[in-house]
């Protein structure tokens, strides 16, 4: 099915002026969600969103403040407007993602376009709303006009007024990082929680980042985020905790400006996903649908990757990225590493990498990631150093050609690592050389990183300038047929539909933080509601040894999960890039549990969300692409969970064998995380399962159709 009704059904109405209080409405295709638009007494645009009879977003203001004299109307695009026309239409298509949680996605919405003109200045601004069965997306559009050409945004005043002191699952705003544990509390409590951790990177004691998950007292789940973030600053939210109104706060650049714009242009979409069923938030594809179709003509080279890597041993302190202790500073092209003494803890040695290649080959993995292979790690962090890496020169103990040829002989690919140390100018200068080097040596995927303060100095991680850089690195990679896994980049907004070579991001608190003191057990039960709505995450699951000091004595961190929980993540945390992150020797101690990681599929035909409550539990079933087989994953937070599911997603009349990897009765993420059971059972369409999940636990299931 592919229908383009929009061009046929749009009707334009010319309106001289819409009186204050008069309302334009648009409904979702199923009629459940209502979008209302009006002008206030002073001509300010405003909107509201209802789901059935329940309010999701109360009447909320819209518009911009531009750089200039704040007392002058010329600095304001948030008042004195009149409506000069509206148009409406319906659009319905089904498109096929290059990879994803299903093989086809329906994009069906009703649209309302409102044309606005500022009375005194004649400046034009349009607002386009798209109303889906699962929510509303809207954006600002500035047409070609003489009265507004180049302009600089001081503030965007998009509001999201909440129906009371609702519950929020949130992380604090930060210009530098998204790597926070989530907090669950009422809106009125955010200020107090934030006051205990305020730092210079937080713009407000009531500021939060998107994607923001909320729940009203009437039982509505509301998610606020953005889609198609291109040539614009990342949106945070600032809460008026007296009136419970969020307002957009754009990440500033080094000068304090929020955006340099030129008409004609449009902003990213502001998204509001809403439902009375938490599972619908996970099932929403609105963020993807609001992005442009794929711009890569030949996508045959883009494919899912299951990999291992020389990474966790460095994260935990067992080995090091650097080569020597002898160099307080490094000058690339001048420093001679052959004349210094190796410290003996370097992880990326030819010998060690070959062990990972052997492990990958023996266990059916696609690739091996190696970090710390290139010169410069001795002084890479904290110095605002421009020429920090060249991305092509290996350390003396990393024989790139030998490793390349050895991996090829074993049928294993290598994944490149480009840590930039946030020296973005340096990375862009070297980007084409680095990508050419990759292709010449058989690397088809790269993990990039942006740890540290930005160069150019003073630039923010999520400003307009940096947003443009992250996308530039992806679009340039596409020219070389390179897949990108970007860490420390701006959080995703669905651009993987347009550029599917962006196969993953980090952009949230990943598994590495389990080695930096630990994460809350419920963290993996909130990420699917927040971070993952914009695109897949390289979460790096699969940790089997939770007591890190057993192999890295100086690290006393504990991984707050059970083995069964770690297995479930390969299903609940969707990504076309999945890592078995632990050390090979830890997998060799638990070969029966490791079998699930080896078996779990990477491509899916459909996904079902069986149980969900933010921060508490998530249970997901996915059907293997071009198969009748399924995998199920269930994760539980700090309180544990009794999972009750039906297998009615299985085809009636067929029989299946299920292998269940579950927490043992005495399992607990703190005291007994490695206790698990494995059992097989025969199931069918009418079967049900009641399974206890330990605190920080869960279960994983492999379901194979029994062939006659």
How would you describe each model-predicted region?
Residues 262-357, 363, 367:
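An acidic-aromatic substrate-binding cleft motif
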Residues 23-297:
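N-terminal accessory beta-strand-rich subdomains and adjacent acidic, glycine-rich linkers
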Residues 614-656, 700-702:
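Carbohydrate-binding surface patches
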Residues 1-23:
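Bacterial Sec-dependent N-terminal signal peptides
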Residues 680-708:
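C-terminal beta-strand-rich structural cap/linker in extracellular carbohydrate-active enzymes
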Residues 371-558, 562:
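Aromatic- and carboxylate-enriched substrate-binding clefts and catalytic-loop regions
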Residues 98-106, 594-622:
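Edge strands and adjacent loops of beta-rich recognition modules
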Residues 564-611:
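Catalytic cores of secreted or luminal carbohydrate-active enzymes
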